[in-house]
């Protein structure tokens, strides 16, 4: 198991979910906490606003997703 403190990510070689967790998680997509949904909606709304006098269309950018 490796811990990256700057990313706050745990990396493990174990499969997920393990046998102890079977039956606890729904099949398919994992549930997303309401705080994340609210933050995503707020960021999308804020990012879609254009400055006054600007006709430029901007695509919303989600800054809290990290790809590695």
Swiss-Prot record:
The keyword Translocase does not apply. Phosphorylated on Ser-59. Phosphorylation decreases stability and activity. Pfam families: Alveol-reg_P311. The keyword Phosphoprotein applies. This is Neuronal regeneration-related protein. It comes from Homo sapiens (Human). The lineage of its organism: Eukaryota, Metazoa, Chordata, Craniata, Vertebrata. Expressed in lung (at protein level). Changing residue 59 to D: Accelerates protein degradation and reduces glioma cell migration. The modification Phosphoserine is found at residue 59. It is found in: Cytoplasm. Its main location: cytoplasm. Residues 44-54 have a biased composition (Polar residues). May have roles in neural function. Ectopic expression augments motility of gliomas. Also promotes axonal regeneration. May also have functions in cellular differentiation. Induces differentiation of fibroblast into myofibroblast and myofibroblast ameboid migration. Increases retinoic-acid regulation of lipid-droplet biogenesis. Down-regulates the expression of TGFB1 and TGFB2 but not of TGFB3. May play a role in the regulation of alveolar generation. One of its GO terms (biological process) is axon regeneration. One of its GO terms (cellular component) is cytoplasm. Induction: Down-regulated in emphysematous lung compared to normal lung. Keywords: Cytoplasm, Phosphoprotein. It comes from the Eukaryota. Residues 22-54 are annotated as: Disordered. Interacts with the latency-associated peptides (LAP) of TGFB1 and TGFB2; the interaction results in a decrease in TGFB autoinduction. Interacts with FLNA.
